[in-house]
Amino acid sequence: MEFSIKSGTPEKQRKDCVVVGVFEARKFSDAAAVLDRASQGYLGDILRTGDIDGKPGSTLLLHSVPGVAAGRVLLVGLGKERELDEHSYRKALRAAIKALHTLDDADVAICLAEVPVKKRDTAWRVAQVVEIAEDSTYRFDRFKSKPANGKKGIAKLQVHVTRRSDVAEGEKGLRQGKALAAGVSFAKDLGNLAPNYCTPSYLAEQAEALSDSHGLQVEVLEKEDIEKLGMGSFLGVTKGSVQPPKLIVLQHRKGKKSQKPVVLVGKGITFDTGGISLKPGADMDEMKYDMCGAASVLGTFKAIAELDLPLNVVGIIPTCENMPDGNATRPGDVLTSMSGQTIEVLNTDAEGRLILCDALTYAERFEPQAVVDVATLTGACVIALGHHASGLFSNKDSLAEELLDAGNEAYDRAWRLPLWDDYQSQLDSNFADMANIGGRAGGSITAACFLSRFAKKYDWAHLDIAGTAWKSGKEKGATGRPVPLLTEFLKQRAGK
């Protein structure tokens, strides 16, 4: 989709469609009022019929409105004028984009960014238009032999602002929205790929391509390098697969040379059968999404590179498959991690923490200001929080607050769960320093407790995205979360 910013009167726009907002109680937005005057009260007559009530997300598509150059006018409900908030605004945008999906290769002008939203500026309103337009029209059809029958929808979207003086702010919002949308789409594409395509080697190739196109530094460590580092926990997960593991290290170095980096660690299990502790067959196909932590790190790097954030950021992605095989790790095996701590593997399906713990130890060499790991780690987190909020754990209150604030700002929310010492005893083992599981009770918490044992030398947070990284059912597909949260967090760290 091609985006642009413009100020000007909506009635003169020679477009396939002009989108304007209406409020409840038959009240016009400023742009809608201009169209009503140009049409000599035509829109007012439409509102009086009650065909659209102005409630958030309601729409009405009109054709050949008198006095308006555009072929169509889409009215979009915004709710009560004095109560227009972020939620209602975003709902209206989604409804508008959905209503226009029947158009074919359309050139559209949207005048919703002109409407005041509580505590939000022009740049934010414009960025939301771009992000929601791209998200709502995203399709993954790489493996379709024939293109889906249907219209192409919107080809060009011109975002209108009220005054010429607003154009610069609008352009800023356009850049931010496009960068974030690109990062989210990249993460979605990686998540949606079939696991016979998206292997650890493929992820490494994508990281290298991203580095080449966006001026990043990248290093891909092979199995031999991982062995030399003493990452016995990571290697224990890889033993059942013919796909070679990779440790991908990305660097965005745009901060001061003396600035310590923020480190993002992404779980990259490109397919998870559960290993010897084999998962049930039902819905196992969705275990291709077990690399969405890695995908979100790559997507975030794409976004911050396009934003040219003045910050030093390191991405660490341990990636492999978890497969059953004659060589695979067995329940009862003891692994020695890079930190020297030993782990009794009671369940090979609790493998994400086994690759992450070595990556967290590896992160120490960068002397980070903070480390955030991202992982589709536990089904227990889905039971606790459902599919709306990611689980957040941290050993530093101020870091947790930053991430919570970033999630609220980006509408990619998280909820903090406890990391109390009381839970640590559930990981006790008779045969090693710890077990890799702590029983059914508090499963997401004990998983975070496990990781915390490898993150004692820096400020650390863990995002469990098992409930938010993808959708099942009719809308099955990767969501791209938490790229918005992570990008906003890094923007705030960079002072942007």
From Swiss-Prot:
Pfam family, one: Peptidase_M17_N
GO BP terms: proteolysis
InterPro entries: Leucine_aapep/pepB, Macro_dom-like, Peptidase_M17_C, Peptidase_M17_leu_NH2_pept, Peptidase_M17_N
UniProt main location, coarse: cytoplasm
Keywords assigned: Aminopeptidase, Cytoplasm, Hydrolase, Manganese, Metal-binding, Protease
EC number: 3.4.11.1, 3.4.11.10
The keyword Glycosyltransferase is assigned to this record: no
Residues that coordinate or bind Mn(2+) 2: K267, D272, D290, E351
Annotated cofactor note: Binds 2 manganese ions per subunit.
GO MF terms, alphabetically ordered: manganese ion binding; metalloaminopeptidase activity
Annotated active site: K279, R353
Cofactors (names): Mn(2+)
Family: Belongs to the peptidase M17 family.
Full protein name: Probable cytosol aminopeptidase
Species of origin: Methylobacillus flagellatus (strain ATCC 51484 / DSM 6875 / VKM B-1610 / KT)
